[in-house]
Amino acid sequence: MAEEQARHVKNGLECIRALKAEPIGSLAVEEAMAAWSEISDNPGQDRATCKEEEAGSSGLSKPCLSAIGSTEGGAPRIRGQGSGESDDDAETLGIPSRNLQASSTGLQCYHVYDHSGEAVKGIQDADSIMVQSGLDGDSTLSGGDDESENSDVDIGEPDTEGYAITDRGSAPISMGFRASDVETAEGGEIHELLKLQSRGNNFPKLGKTLNVPPPPNPSRASTSETPIKKGHRREIGLIWNGDRVFIDRWCNPMCSKVTLGTIRARCTCGECPRVCEQCRTDTGVDTRIWYHNLPEIPE
């Protein structure tokens, strides 16, 4: 398998060198393109002719010459190997040897396959070389040995007989998105979404909204939004003396903090009244023991 591949590559390089040594004219290029167009329309006819030519040959050492049509002078156009082709093959098909150099396209297709039988992509073939019109002695052909490894030519899918069907009318293959490009695009979209959300944009048109509750304000956490009603509140205390339970009741300002113990609190807002209706009837105001802070409460 490796020797066969090496032979295919060697033959292809020989074709390229022959074309570089003796460039073909623009008329031959136009005829070659027309010939390949006819072959792509009727691939079965070309394969049948190639089978007959390969019946007496040992492999790909000789090109497959097929009559494709007739030129203006009546001689058919052929597909040959170039200037290195012998005149014996032309005489076999009835073509004069003097017209072989003018009518031959000089394009021979060699394909390289791996050990599994799949065509190796990225190998530029001799049939992919495009010759510019009006070539002079100093002009060079596009392609060649230096570009054979970096080519993007699709050699097609090989059939059961080893021929590759090349679609010359297909559009060039476009590069796809990489995974890193997709991740970058998604990350940029999320970043833009958060950036606009911080500015107060709720995306009414796009339908994208990030509802983030505002952080609590520590200064407003301890105070209520509604003002405290001014006045007094009634407090109740239970006293256990070992035999009985005594219930004591008294009043404190509404704005004062509720604490443990019998404490007479003071007004902090300055608007609560000193006495209320219940304070006036309280008989223990003068006899009650008031504790002003927690350490004063006996255990």
UniProtKB/Swiss-Prot annotation:
Keyword line: Host cytoplasm, Host-virus interaction, Inhibition of host innate immune response by virus, Inhibition of host interferon signaling pathway by virus, Inhibition of host IRF7 by virus, Inhibition of host MDA5 by virus, Inhibition of host RLR pathway by virus, Inhibition of host STAT2 by virus, Interferon antiviral system evasion, Metal-binding, Viral immunoevasion, Zinc
Residue stretches of biased makeup (Low complexity): 133-143
Acidic residues bias spans: 144-160
Phenotype when changing W240A: Impaired interaction with host STAT2. Loss of ability to block IFN-alpha/beta signaling
Binding locations of Zn(2+) 1: H232, C251, C276, C279
GO process terms (BP): symbiont-mediated suppression of host cytoplasmic pattern recognition receptor signaling pathway via inhibition of IRF7 activity; symbiont-mediated suppression of host cytoplasmic pattern recognition receptor signaling pathway via inhibition of MDA-5 activity; symbiont-mediated suppression of host JAK-STAT cascade via inhibition of STAT2 activity; symbiont-mediated suppression of host type I interferon-mediated signaling pathway
InterPro entries reported in the protein's UniProt record: Paramyx_V_Zn-bd, Paramyxo_P/V_N
Region annotated Interaction with host STAT1, chain positions: 110-120
Signal peptide from the UniProt entry: none
Residues that coordinate or bind Zn(2+) 2: C255, C267, C269, C272
Pfam families: Paramyxo_P_V_N, zf-Paramyx-P
Principal location listed in the UniProt entry: host cell
Site feature: Interaction with host STAT2: W240, F246, D248, W250
Molecular function via GO: metal ion binding
Intracellular or extracellular location(s): Host cytoplasm
Chain intervals for the UniProt region annotation (Disordered): 40-94, 133-168, 204-229
Known partners and oligomeric status: Interacts with host IFIH1/MDA5 and DHX58/LGP2; these interactions are involved in the inhibition of the host type I interferon signaling pathway. Interacts with host TYK2; this interaction inhibits the type I interferon signaling pathway without affecting the type II pathway. Interacts with host IRF7; this interaction inhibits IRF7 translocation to the nucleus. Interacts with host CHUK. Interacts with host RELA/p65; this interaction inhibits the nuclear translocation of NF-KappaB.
Biological function: Plays an essential role in the inhibition of host immune response. Prevents the establishment of cellular antiviral state by blocking interferon-alpha/beta (IFN-alpha/beta) production and signaling pathway. Interacts with host IFIH1/MDA5 and DHX58/LGP2 to inhibit the transduction pathway involved in the activation of IFN-beta promoter, thus protecting the virus against cell antiviral state. Blocks the type I interferon signaling pathway by interacting with host TYK2 and thereby inhibiting downstream STAT1 and STAT2 phosphorylation.
Comment on protein domains: The N-terminus interacts with host JAK1 and STAT1. The C-terminus interacts with host STAT2. The C-terminus also interacts with host PP1.
UniProt record similarity statement: Belongs to the paramyxoviruses V protein family.
Protein name, as recorded: Non-structural protein V
Gene designation per UniProt: P/V
